[in-house]
Amino acid sequence: MKTILFLMSVLLFFSFNILKLSAQINDYFTPLPKSIPVIKNNPITPQKIDLGKKLYFDPRLSASGVISCNTCHNLSVSGDDNLPTSVGHGWAKGDRNAPTVYNAVFNVAQFWDGRAEDLKEQAKGPIQEAVEMHSNPALVVKTLKSMPEYVSLFEKAFPESTDALSFNNITKAIEAFEATLLTPSSKFDKYLEGDETSLTENEKKGLDLFIEKGCADCHGGINIGGEDYYPFGVVEKPGAEILPPDDKGRFSVTQTASDEYVFRASPLRNVAITAPYFHSGQVWDLGQAVMIMGNSQLGEEISNNEALLITTFLHTLSGERPKIALPILPTREKDTPKPQI
């Protein structure tokens, strides 16, 4: 009888903990949708997506004619370039690590400091940034208008516009394509949808630690992050290599003292393949990144074993990347600017 009572108590204990974890999971996380979300002020159409795809891969949006969106946000790998900071115009290096474009449509805003409200606003930045594509709206529009096929594609994608091939419509088309770059059906998504067998015991232990330690307080929602802004170094600031003192994050946008060293929480979907980590791009090991966040944000000394379990869970956030065929780009004409290297 004592044995039976003991086994029943053990069963009840584990059942209670499973129910408790399930309740916490539903509070923190949402499965990634498999369909394109509704985009504010930019109804998505097949014509816009097709045009946006061409623009995304076309290096002629840059002043040099050799840098495309895909250069720094490579869809063949992880939607970024796996470099500490991106290499742009004239081999110049940017100041921050390039975030992945996959699932970026679900972020509260774009860029580490949230200076772009949405993807169409974000697309304007790199095109005009001196160390990235080094171009300007007038040059980009002139370049694309030199190719009749682009003119026709814009007229089909924006039939309501009197001047279809405009800089605003260029960025709207890019946004339409980027909104399709979703990576659903990760192991964790399946778990969120009710498949208890999709995660191993160690992955579940890692998830439990992720919640218990407080990681999920900043990294939750659809994108497991990307929903709000937080100071980097709540408890203890990391070293200058990881948190450069001259990069004050969101302060550069708001000029509000309380926003110094505040950054958008990094979305963790596909984090296992998006190294290096942090806005400085100086940490290559995911376990090390977990330990740094434990010290800096939570005041927690995360052990090697705990970091291993948490990273085991983080690997379950890798979803199915879309299969994307390279587009055939419009042919250059005699008035199309030549590449400048």
Write out the residue ranges for each language-model feature.
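Bacterial Sec-dependent N-terminal signal peptides
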Residues: 1-24
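Periplasmic c-type cytochrome electron-transfer domains
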Residues: 19-341
